[in-house]
Amino acid sequence: MRCLPVFVILLLLIASAPSVDAQPKTKDDIPQASFLDNAKRYLQVLESKRNCCRRQICCGRTK
């Protein structure tokens, strides 16, 4: 009988804990991976532009 109150309290705590499905995804939710992919792609574009201008072949300048 001593364990019954502890068992009931644990059941109440488990039932009130938020689950994974507590917040349904909306169309505005974007996975973290896509943010990282976009950041990598943006950095690659910047790097290619910097290398391009360093070689002066696509910045409108001639050697």
Swiss-Prot record:
Top-level division of the source organism's lineage: Eukaryota
Location, primary (coarse class): secreted
Organism lineage string: Eukaryota, Metazoa, Spiralia, Lophotrochozoa, Mollusca
Gene Ontology cellular component annotations, sorted alphabetically: extracellular region
GO molecular function: toxin activity
Signal peptide residues on this chain, from the entry's feature table: 1-22
Entry keyword set: Cleavage on pair of basic residues, Disulfide bond, Neurotoxin, Secreted, Signal, Toxin
Expression sites (tissue/organ): Expressed by the venom duct.
UniProt organism field: Conus textile (Cloth-of-gold cone)
Propeptide: 23-48
UniProt protein name: Conotoxin TeAr193
Compartments where located: Secreted
Post-translational modification: Contains 2 disulfide bonds that can be either 'C1-C3, C2-C4' or 'C1-C4, C2-C3', since these disulfide connectivities have been observed for conotoxins with cysteine framework V (for examples, see AC P0DQQ7 and AC P81755).
The record's note on its domains: The cysteine framework is V (CC-CC).
Family from the record: Belongs to the conotoxin T superfamily.
